[in-house]
Protein backbone atom coordinates (compact mmCIF):
# COMPACT_ATOMS: atom_id res chain seq x y z
CA UNK A 1 0.00 0.00 0.00
CA UNK A 2 1.32 3.42 -0.93
CA UNK A 3 1.41 6.52 1.21
CA UNK A 4 -0.78 9.61 1.37
CA UNK A 5 1.50 12.60 0.94
CA UNK A 6 1.73 16.24 -0.01
CA UNK A 7 3.77 17.64 -2.87
CA UNK A 8 3.85 21.44 -2.88
CA UNK A 9 6.23 24.34 -3.40
CA UNK A 10 6.39 26.34 -0.17
CA UNK A 11 8.10 29.61 0.72
CA UNK A 12 10.39 29.77 3.73
CA UNK A 13 7.60 31.55 5.64
CA UNK A 14 5.10 28.79 4.84
CA UNK A 15 3.02 30.08 1.93
CA UNK A 16 2.03 28.09 -1.17
CA UNK A 17 0.78 31.15 -3.08
CA UNK A 18 0.89 34.90 -2.74
CA UNK A 19 -1.99 37.18 -1.69
CA UNK A 20 -5.10 37.64 -3.83
CA UNK A 21 -4.94 34.38 -5.74
CA UNK A 22 -7.78 33.68 -8.17
CA UNK A 23 -8.62 32.15 -11.56
CA UNK A 24 -6.72 34.91 -13.39
CA UNK A 25 -3.72 34.69 -11.04
CA UNK A 26 -3.65 31.17 -9.51
CA UNK A 27 -0.35 31.82 -7.71
CA UNK A 28 -1.40 35.22 -6.32
CA UNK A 29 0.74 38.33 -6.12
CA UNK A 30 4.40 37.32 -6.19
CA UNK A 31 3.54 33.63 -6.01
CA UNK A 32 5.28 32.89 -9.29
CA UNK A 33 8.53 33.06 -7.29
CA UNK A 34 7.58 29.68 -5.85
CA UNK A 35 7.96 28.14 -9.30
CA UNK A 36 11.24 29.84 -10.25
CA UNK A 37 13.22 26.70 -9.39
CA UNK A 38 11.72 24.96 -12.42
CA UNK A 39 14.05 27.10 -14.55
CA UNK A 40 16.96 27.61 -12.16
CA UNK A 41 19.23 24.75 -13.24
CA UNK A 42 21.11 23.45 -16.26
CA UNK A 43 19.57 19.98 -16.63
CA UNK A 44 16.61 19.64 -18.97
CA UNK A 45 13.64 17.60 -17.72
CA UNK A 46 10.59 17.09 -19.92
CA UNK A 47 7.40 16.03 -18.18
CA UNK A 48 6.30 12.89 -20.06
CA UNK A 49 3.19 13.30 -22.17
CA UNK A 50 3.38 17.09 -22.15
CA UNK A 51 5.32 19.89 -23.80
CA UNK A 52 6.44 21.15 -20.38
CA UNK A 53 10.24 21.41 -20.26
CA UNK A 54 12.03 22.39 -17.04
CA UNK A 55 15.66 23.33 -16.48
CA UNK A 56 16.61 22.16 -13.02
CA UNK A 57 19.54 20.64 -11.15
CA UNK A 58 20.38 16.96 -11.85
CA UNK A 59 19.19 16.09 -8.36
CA UNK A 60 15.85 17.82 -8.92
CA UNK A 61 15.39 16.14 -12.31
CA UNK A 62 15.79 12.75 -10.65
CA UNK A 63 13.42 13.78 -7.87
CA UNK A 64 10.74 14.92 -10.34
CA UNK A 65 10.97 11.68 -12.32
CA UNK A 66 10.71 9.65 -9.14
CA UNK A 67 7.71 11.64 -7.92
CA UNK A 68 5.83 11.04 -11.16
CA UNK A 69 6.69 7.32 -11.15
CA UNK A 70 5.56 6.75 -7.56
CA UNK A 71 2.30 8.73 -7.74
CA UNK A 72 -0.79 6.67 -8.51
CA UNK A 73 -3.62 9.15 -7.91
CA UNK A 74 -4.28 12.61 -6.49
CA UNK A 75 -6.86 14.35 -4.31
CA UNK A 76 -7.62 18.06 -4.57
CA UNK A 77 -10.28 20.41 -3.28
CA UNK A 78 -12.80 22.24 -5.42
CA UNK A 79 -11.02 25.58 -5.00
CA UNK A 80 -7.78 24.26 -6.50
CA UNK A 81 -9.76 22.60 -9.27
CA UNK A 82 -11.46 25.91 -10.09
CA UNK A 83 -8.25 27.96 -9.87
CA UNK A 84 -6.56 25.68 -12.41
CA UNK A 85 -9.65 25.41 -14.62
CA UNK A 86 -9.51 21.67 -14.06
CA UNK A 87 -6.09 21.52 -15.73
CA UNK A 88 -7.93 21.45 -19.04
CA UNK A 89 -9.17 17.93 -18.34
CA UNK A 90 -5.72 16.41 -17.78
CA UNK A 91 -3.43 16.94 -14.81
CA UNK A 92 0.23 17.47 -15.84
CA UNK A 93 1.23 14.25 -14.05
CA UNK A 94 -1.42 12.38 -16.08
CA UNK A 95 -2.83 10.58 -13.03
CA UNK A 96 -6.44 10.04 -11.88
CA UNK A 97 -7.71 13.03 -9.89
CA UNK A 98 -10.37 12.95 -7.18
CA UNK A 99 -11.96 16.33 -6.45
CA UNK A 100 -13.61 16.89 -3.07
CA UNK A 101 -16.66 19.07 -3.70
CA UNK A 102 -20.17 19.74 -2.47
CA UNK A 103 -21.55 19.56 -6.00
CA UNK A 104 -20.49 18.26 -9.40
CA UNK A 105 -19.66 21.13 -11.80
CA UNK A 106 -22.38 21.46 -14.41
CA UNK A 107 -20.09 22.98 -17.03
CA UNK A 108 -17.49 20.18 -17.05
CA UNK A 109 -16.88 19.42 -20.72
CA UNK A 110 -14.17 16.77 -20.40
CA UNK A 111 -16.32 13.67 -20.16
CA UNK A 112 -14.22 10.52 -20.01
CA UNK A 113 -11.23 12.31 -18.49
CA UNK A 114 -9.71 10.76 -15.33
CA UNK A 115 -11.51 13.11 -12.92
CA UNK A 116 -13.90 11.89 -10.22
CA UNK A 117 -16.01 14.39 -8.27
CA UNK A 118 -16.50 13.15 -4.71
CA UNK A 119 -19.45 14.65 -2.84
CA UNK A 120 -19.37 12.50 0.30
CA UNK A 121 -16.27 13.91 1.94
CA UNK A 122 -12.49 13.85 2.11
CA UNK A 123 -12.12 10.39 3.63
CA UNK A 124 -14.16 8.89 0.82
CA UNK A 125 -12.01 10.68 -1.76
CA UNK A 126 -8.79 9.44 -0.17
CA UNK A 127 -10.07 5.86 0.03
CA UNK A 128 -11.14 5.93 -3.61
CA UNK A 129 -7.78 7.37 -4.62
CA UNK A 130 -5.90 4.71 -2.63
CA UNK A 131 -7.91 1.96 -4.31
CA UNK A 132 -6.95 3.29 -7.73
CA UNK A 133 -3.32 3.98 -6.80
CA UNK A 134 -2.69 0.46 -5.51
CA UNK A 135 0.92 0.22 -4.33
CA UNK A 136 1.68 3.77 -5.42
CA UNK A 137 1.24 6.99 -3.45
CA UNK A 138 -1.71 9.36 -3.29
CA UNK A 139 -0.75 13.02 -3.61
CA UNK A 140 -2.99 15.55 -1.84
CA UNK A 141 -3.32 19.32 -2.16
CA UNK A 142 -3.62 22.15 -1.76
CA UNK A 143 -3.65 23.89 1.65
CA UNK A 144 -7.18 23.14 2.87
CA UNK A 145 -7.06 19.48 1.82
CA UNK A 146 -3.64 19.03 3.42
CA UNK A 147 -4.88 20.58 6.66
CA UNK A 148 -7.98 18.38 6.67
CA UNK A 149 -5.87 15.28 6.02
CA UNK A 150 -3.60 16.13 8.95
CA UNK A 151 -6.53 16.71 11.30
CA UNK A 152 -8.18 13.45 10.19
CA UNK A 153 -4.97 11.45 10.64
CA UNK A 154 -4.86 10.57 6.92
CA UNK A 155 -1.50 12.11 5.98
CA UNK A 156 1.56 9.84 6.06
CA UNK A 157 4.26 12.10 4.64
CA UNK A 158 4.94 15.75 3.90
CA UNK A 159 6.88 16.31 0.68
CA UNK A 160 7.85 19.97 0.54
CA UNK A 161 9.72 21.84 -2.17
CA UNK A 162 11.11 24.58 0.07
CA UNK A 163 11.80 27.66 -2.03
CA UNK A 164 14.42 30.13 -0.89
CA UNK A 165 12.12 33.13 -0.66
CA UNK A 166 9.93 34.95 1.87
CA UNK A 167 6.53 35.83 0.38
CA UNK A 168 5.26 37.77 3.39
CA UNK A 169 1.64 36.72 2.91
CA UNK A 170 -0.76 34.57 0.95
CA UNK A 171 -2.19 31.09 1.44
CA UNK A 172 -0.51 29.34 4.38
CA UNK A 173 0.04 25.60 4.04
CA UNK A 174 -0.31 24.84 7.74
CA UNK A 175 -2.98 27.29 8.84
CA UNK A 176 -6.09 26.22 10.80
CA UNK A 177 -4.64 22.95 12.14
CA UNK A 178 -5.88 23.40 15.71
CA UNK A 179 -4.52 19.99 16.65
CA UNK A 180 -1.61 20.91 18.91
CA UNK A 181 2.00 19.92 18.21
CA UNK A 182 2.49 17.34 15.46
CA UNK A 183 5.80 15.50 15.53
CA UNK A 184 7.61 14.90 12.25
CA UNK A 185 10.60 12.76 11.33
CA UNK A 186 12.78 14.15 8.57
CA UNK A 187 13.61 11.28 6.24
CA UNK A 188 15.12 12.95 3.18
CA UNK A 189 16.83 16.15 2.05
CA UNK A 190 17.68 16.90 -1.59
CA UNK A 191 19.44 20.16 -2.42
CA UNK A 192 18.45 21.62 -5.78
CA UNK A 193 18.98 24.94 -7.54
CA UNK A 194 16.84 27.50 -5.72
CA UNK A 195 14.94 24.81 -3.84
CA UNK A 196 15.39 22.20 -1.13
CA UNK A 197 13.23 19.08 -1.44
CA UNK A 198 12.28 17.87 2.04
CA UNK A 199 10.43 14.74 3.13
CA UNK A 200 8.98 14.28 6.62
CA UNK A 201 7.12 11.31 8.05
CA UNK A 202 4.09 12.29 10.11
CA UNK A 203 4.36 10.63 13.52
CA UNK A 204 1.05 9.01 14.48
Cite the ranges covered by each PLM segment.
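Enzymes that bind and transform nitrogen-containing heteroaromatic metabolites
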Residues: 1-204
Amino acid sequence: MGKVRTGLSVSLDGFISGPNDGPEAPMGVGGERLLAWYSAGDTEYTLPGTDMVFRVSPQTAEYLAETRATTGAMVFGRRTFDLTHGWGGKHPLDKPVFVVTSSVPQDWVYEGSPFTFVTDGLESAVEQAKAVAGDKDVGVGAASIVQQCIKAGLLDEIHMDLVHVLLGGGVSLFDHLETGPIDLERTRVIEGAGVTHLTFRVMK
